[in-house]
Amino acid sequence: MNTMENKIIKSKKAQVSLEFSFLFLAILLASIITISHFLSQNFTKDDKVISDVENAAKTAVILANSGYNGINPNVTLIYGGISWSGNKKNIYIYISPKSYITPEIKNFIVSYIYNVTKINQSEYNITVNP
């Protein structure tokens, strides 16, 4: 092979590689747009708030168990879960054992959730062990 044929072969390989890269980029972009559209259509602001509240509630229970802010529950508190009303504006946090959840612990958990998540207190009502 002479040098001219080598240049043509290398040029074709480079062009195929470039075309493949553009095709891959187009497919990737279309996938990202589709996923983004799906998520924006199926998850609302309220869903994000509930997720944030759940994470903050778990952290608040861990902090309460560690004696944070002078809280002494005398037992290990267990985060039991979260539920919400149909309109997702009333959020309920379940912690056990219920008999050891004092008003001080409830207030700490609710205050911690509002402070960390920065959600509007007049829009969302958080209750511990309803």
Swiss-Prot record:
A GO cellular-component term linked to this record: extracellular region
Short sequence motif QXSXEXXXL: positions: 15-23
Changes after translation: The N-terminus is cleaved by the prepilin peptidase EppA, which recognizes the class III signal sequence.
Any coiled-coil regions, as ranges: none
Superkingdom: Archaea
Alphabetical keyword list: Fimbrium, Secreted
Subcellular compartments: Secreted; Cell surface; Fimbrium
Keyword Transmembrane helix: no
Propeptide position ranges: 1-14
InterPro entries (UniProt xref): Class3_signal_pept_motif
Main location: secreted
Domain notes: Contains an amino terminal motif QXSXEXXXL, which is part of a class III signal sequence.
Name by which UniProt lists this protein: Probable pilin MJ0835.1
Species name: Methanocaldococcus jannaschii (strain ATCC 43067 / DSM 2661 / JAL-1 / JCM 10045 / NBRC 100440) (Methanococcus jannaschii)
